[in-house]
Amino acid sequence: MLTLRFVSGSIEVHGEAPDGLTLPPLPHAAHDDRAGCLRAPAVAYADIVRTLVRAKVPFIDEARRYEQLDLKVRAAREPRPFQTEAIDAWRAAHGRGVVVLPTGSGKTHVAMMAIAEKQRSTLVVAPTLDLVRQWYDLLGSTFGHPIGLIGGGEHKVLPLTVTTYDSAHLHMDHLGSRFGFVIFDECHHLPSGAYAHAALACLAPFRLGLTATPERTDGRDFRTLVGPIVYRKEIGDLAGEYLASYDTETIAISLSAEERAAYDEARGTYRAFIEKHHIRMGDPAGWGTFIRLSAGSTEGQEAMRAYRRQRELAFTAPAKMQYLGHLLHQHRGDQLIIFTQDNASAYRIAREFLLPVITHQTKVRERSHILKGFTARTYGAIVTSKVLNEGVDVPDASVAIIVSGSGSVREHVQRLGRILRKRAGKQALLYELVTEATAEGYVSERRRDHDAYR
């Protein structure tokens, strides 16, 4: 008799098919000489079971340790039509796949509907502790059950549990058999190196990925890890009815003659170095190559200083700071989020305009205090670098000002999403401040290559 076992993030298949039956090829399984059995990554569990059932080969399943639950939704609300469509599409894909919905449109409600339907032990994986806390609270209020938590110094495993990607990667080798349903929030993180292990080492037959921005520049996808994209709506599909209506405005900022000369000189030094060494900054490895080569010579160190100088001139030009002050005055009755590309720019703006600032260096208690003050309108504006791009609910924000940013389409769409939470009479507005005739122009064009900006 065949026996399936879960061992260290993998499925072991022991024994042989009964006489008269032929064991079919099992998906992703290969013979492990040391263990004397077939072995496959745990993610292949459902496919292996399906293959054996179809071939009518009997087996003993010692792998799965998850429970059938009896969850009741405490205060069910009518789903929006697109949420019902998303669940229908996911169900049609046998409970595996990715749902793409804009920030603020109710992705988490889709997840609650899926949990209530499948009634299996469920693990929710999220990228940040802030998001983990939001899921923890939402699961508890929705189902009225104790919720497990792994991460941030906690380690309590229950039939409904929330964890971070980092903790899931570390613990899935021994927890991967305890959940029949796994939800990956912000699942565009999932294909990244170690994070993929969290999906590969889990045997959950049912999987749901949630994201507003599924595309990755490295070409990796999540079909094997969680399933294909089964449903998709963009910001433009939902704006006005389910998301706030919005406008975007790009403001051209000019350098002074003196700043222009300094920028051109620094830019020239930097460009000369990367051209001399044939460094392609558009390639995924370009930045790492530049760092490595610039550290090895005086010429390279000068190129790195020049690179930082030209960025500083473009990111925080005096005219840009002046226009930012104008916008702060113009929108003094609104709730604003000011985004920058780096911490130095964020701290400079915070000092100049006496605004609270949140970066990855901000302590949890201080960050919580600032966000509560923003919600209570004690603070009319907050400054941040990248840490608020995703995973923090700021429903009162209605104006975003992009002082600087990367060329990432995902980042730009995420920043727009911060201000699109629907509220009666709300008209959201995103400003992008771009220093003319600098690399910012090209970066702006790249990041605005999305339907939300057309």
Q: Where are the predicted features?
A:
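Accessory DNA-engaging acidic/polar modules
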Residues: 1-85
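Walker A/P-loop
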Residues: 93-115
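Conserved helicase ATPase core of P-loop NTP-dependent helicases/translocases
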Residues: 133, 144-157, 335-339, 344-350, ...
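Conserved helix/coil segment N-terminal to the catalytic DExD/H
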Residues: 151-181, 192-197, 387
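A short beta-strand element within the Helicase C-terminal
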Residues: 177-180, 383, 390-406, 411, ...
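Post-DEXD/H (motif II) to motif III coupling segment of the RecA-like Helicase ATP-binding lobe
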Residues: 188-247, 265, 272
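Conserved helicase/translocase motor-coupling segment
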Residues: 285-363, 367-369
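Conserved segment of the helicase C-terminal RecA-like domain
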Residues: 418-447
